[in-house]
Amino acid sequence: MKRQSMDDERSDRDGLRGHLPDEDDASTTLVNLSPYYGHLDCFSGICPLVVKTNRFTYAPSYPPNDQIQNTWLSIALEGIGALFSYCAPRAAFRQVAVIGTGNGLDVVGISRIVRPPEIVASDIHPGVIQAARWNIAHYVAEECKVTVRQSDLFTDYPAGEAFDLIYENLPNIPDGTDLFEGIRSASCYAPRAHGVRSACDRYLLTLHHDFLVQARSRLHDSGWVVCLIGGRFPVRVIHRMFRTAGYRSMVVGFGLKIQSEADVVLPAYAAVERENGSSFAYYHPLEKCISISRELSQPTDLLSRGGYARRLTERLRNCRVSATEAARLHHDGDSVCHTVYVIAGSMMPKERSDG
């Protein structure tokens, strides 16, 4: 019998429902998957969840979720749900990939919203895969076949494997921030070796750009990519990145998130501001940001969400602080937040040949 590969293991419900391989390193966390922008019917009966985490996984700490999220998961899931409803009359998301799955809760949520027959989930960190497999085995319905593998973007995906929907949750963290060993998968990545890409490098979007370029060969013709990106800069920078990579793009979700791992991340962003002249947007005080966000409701109409994001960002203008100021505020005991964009992209039509 051929032995199953550790890097490409099918989720075996019977084998994974027991213990994590490193049980001493595991703990449980209560998390509510219901998005705060309207509780989707598909989440009924599964919230809250008691999920497995370890020292490598991002552990949500707001059970249930607050108006300002400490985790971006519900913002992403609501955006994916809106895109699915928008596309449902014309297209089905049957093959789905999740890049940078972390503890696997994005797979759980997507399986409930999209209900695809097949999901492939991957993360670069081997320690994360343990927790992801356990959570997926416990909370994804058996009708959905899930493959969990360790991979740096699409490096370990078989040639020719393609999808209708590819969702990514990748970090835009300063290169000098050493988070790979011992913190959380959502904030770590392998160093990239390539030249300067102007705005992509300036705003720490290189990893997202690499994903978009590689995803083109992994999408079916009518497929979609969905990127979750911390919006510490103008959204036009993100749309330009999509366009140069060959995609049309639109905002499908938007929200506010408290900066996690602030002791490490905020000084790193402040250093980038000093070194290359970038300007990153944080918001403070939280109470005022919460009040402003509650005054504006995210529209159900998908095509109106870009305008909503612009209006809310404009309303938050007087709360904006730089990363340098945000680091000082955090040092003094205050929390800061930033915006989060869920951006969907579809491939631009190929140019016709004159011949």
Model-based region annotation:
Residues N103-P116:
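Conserved SAM-binding loop of SAM-dependent methyltransferases across substrates and taxa
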Residues E161, Y167-L207:
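Mobile active-site "lid"/loop adjacent to the S-adenosyl-L-methionine
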Residues V31-A91:
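Class I SAM-dependent transferase core
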Residues K2-P48:
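N-terminal auxiliary segments of SAM/dcSAM-dependent transferases
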Residues A92-G102:
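Conserved class I S-adenosyl-L-methionine
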Residues A131-G160, L165-E168:
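S-adenosyl-L-methionine
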Residues R202-G255:
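Conserved Class I SAM-dependent methyltransferase catalytic core
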Residues E118-D123:
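Conserved SAM-binding motif I beta-strand of class I
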